[in-house]
């Protein structure tokens, strides 16, 4: 399994060419693709704030984007929420990024992200 940061999920599901060659190859070869439920919330917030436009309403987009047989929706478990809050101060402070990173660590899977701050924090557990 690989875990997708929200922007990677949006680009992959939307067929946007922003993905790196490595990210695209990892997505094509993955047997399972994890999407955290917090990414659904983040996407809805970005749409509401006008920072992201979708070709349909956000609920329909999420349902369609989670419909791929390889995609697994991952809930925010209490242990992961606690881990995200306890991560050291060097990790970027964005709560969504912290939750995504804690989820990847808990599942021992790579986090696919373009976010340089996350990649600098832990180059071994992230990929782009």
Regions found by a protein language model. Name each.
Residues 69, 121-122:
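Short, structured coil segments at secondary-structure junctions
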Residues 1-35, 49-64, 107, 116-117, ...:
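Short, well-structured N-terminal submotif of metal-dependent ribonuclease cores
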Residues 6-7, 43, 84, 104:
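Generic structural signal for small/hydrophobic residues in well-ordered secondary structure
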Residues 5, 42, 97, 115:
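Acidic active-site catalytic centers that drive phospho-/nucleotidyl reactions
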Residues 53-59, 67-114:
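Active-site neighborhoods of divalent-metal-dependent phosphate/nucleic-acid chemistry enzymes
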Residues 123-128:
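Active-site regions of enzymes building and remodeling cell-envelope glycoconjugates
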């Amino acid at each position: 399994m690989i875990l997708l940061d929200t922007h990677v999920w949006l680009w992959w599901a939307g067929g946007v060419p922003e993905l790196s060659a490595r990210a695209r190859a990892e997505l094509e070869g993955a047997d399972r693709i994890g999407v955290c439920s917090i990414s659904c919330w983040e996407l809805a917030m970005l749409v509401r704030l006008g920072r992201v436009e979708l070709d349909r309403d956000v609920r329909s987009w999420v349902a369609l984007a989670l419909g791929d047989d390889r995609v697994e929706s991952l809930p925010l478990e209490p242990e992961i929420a606690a881990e995200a809050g306890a991560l050291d101060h060097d990790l970027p402070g964005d709560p969504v990024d912290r939750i995504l990173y804690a989820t990847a660590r808990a599942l021992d899977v790579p986090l696919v992200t373009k976010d340089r701050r996350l990649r600098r924090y832990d180059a071994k557990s992230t990929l782009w």
